[in-house]
């Protein structure tokens, strides 16, 4: 990694984001889930339980890229432009959903303010997990770790390929295989387990 994680998050917050398409409309009805009052204890417990270091969770919260909603106590990952959010349940019942202003929006985190490669994952927790795995392996480089909220979001993949070299890093399952076949011209990175968070857990809890 070319800079500390703190510096990387600061760089992310100063980054102006990926260029917008000139033809996109504005004013689309969109709202983020209501934010709970800190300290977001359910989100912190959930993500640290998934192998994400407390330092990483707290930095994402501090930089307004992650919060806990109310009344459901979900984890909400918010894109820097606030036009996309990914909602992850923190309770015993699994829940994963997205809200976005336009269909091609996405969540991302950078390891450098001038990314040279975008690693495209299915979920924000997997994007963060892959970033942490690369950090352990010493291969973060100048990268953006992106969540598209599911492999059906082909418009986002197409948009990203017009901005940066893309590596498909979607799940190791049938839907991921379909996505790789659909984008056969793109390089791929496939998790050993079902997804990158499972791979991270295998590293931190051998």
Please tell me what each predicted stretch does.
Residues 1-49:
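Non-catalytic accessory segments of DNA primases and related replication-initiation nucleases
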Residues 44-56, 80:
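Serine endopeptidase catalytic core focused on the charge-relay Asp
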Residues 55-76, 100-107:
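Active-site-proximal, Lys/Arg-enriched surface segment
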Residues 78-83, 90:
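Short acidic-glycine loop/turn motifs at beta-strand connectors
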Residues 95-116:
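Glycine-/acidic-rich phosphate or pyrophosphate-binding loops and their flanking alpha/beta elements
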Residues 122-123, 172:
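Helix N-cap/beta->alpha junction signal
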């Amino acid at each position: 990694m070319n800079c500390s994680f703190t510096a990387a998050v600061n760089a992310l917050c100063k980054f102006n984001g990926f260029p917008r398409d000139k033809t996109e409309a504005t004013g689309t009805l969109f709202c983020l889930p209501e934010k709970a009052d800190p300290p977001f204890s359910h989100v912190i417990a959930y993500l640290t339980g998934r192998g994400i270091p407390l330092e990483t969770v707290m930095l994402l919260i501090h930089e307004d890229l992650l919060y806990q909603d109310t009344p459901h106590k979900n984890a909400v990952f918010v894109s820097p432009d606030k036009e996309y959010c990914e909602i992850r349940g923190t309770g015993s019942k699994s829940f994963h959903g997205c809200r976005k202003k336009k269909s091609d929006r996405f969540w991302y985190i950078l390891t450098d303010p001038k990314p040279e490669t975008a690693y495209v994952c299915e979920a924000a927790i997997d994007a963060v997990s892959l970033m942490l795995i690369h950090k352990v392996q010493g291969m973060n480089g100048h990268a953006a770790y992106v969540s598209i909220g599911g492999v059906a979001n082909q418009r986002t993949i197409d948009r990203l390929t017009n901005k940066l070299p893309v590596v498909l890093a979607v799940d190791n399952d049938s839907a991921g295989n379909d996505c790789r076949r659909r984008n056969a011209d793109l390089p791929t990175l496939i998790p050993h387990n079902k997804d990158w968070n499972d791979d991270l857990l295998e590293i931190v809890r051998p």
